[in-house]
Amino acid sequence: MPKMKTKSGAKKRFRVRPGGTVKRGQAFKRHILTKKTTKNKRQLRGSVGVHDTNMVSVRAMMPNA
């Protein structure tokens, strides 16, 4: 049976925290920023955790993490 490989796109987008939760970057922060308010852009900084409903999919993409 072949090795289970991590999806390269998931490898670039997600990081697994020591507790087992997964963190991801915020969306909507790449372009068309002029019409977004300063408050909105500030709140999009940093990273957030992956929601529980998506955790199974993310875990399936990263079997070795």
UniProtKB/Swiss-Prot annotation:
Transmembrane segments: none annotated. The keyword Secreted does not apply. GO terms for cellular component: cytosolic large ribosomal subunit. Keywords: Ribonucleoprotein, Ribosomal protein. GO terms for biological process: translation. Residues 1-16 have a biased composition (Basic residues). GO terms for molecular function: structural constituent of ribosome. InterPro entries: Ribosomal_bL35, Ribosomal_bL35-like, Ribosomal_bL35_CS, Ribosomal_bL35_sf. Pfam families: Ribosomal_L35p. Signal peptide: none annotated. SUPFAM superfamilies: L35p-like (SSF143034). Residues 1-25 are annotated as: Disordered. Belongs to the bacterial ribosomal protein bL35 family. This is Large ribosomal subunit protein bL35. It comes from Herminiimonas arsenicoxydans. The lineage of its organism: Bacteria, Pseudomonadati, Pseudomonadota, Betaproteobacteria, Burkholderiales.
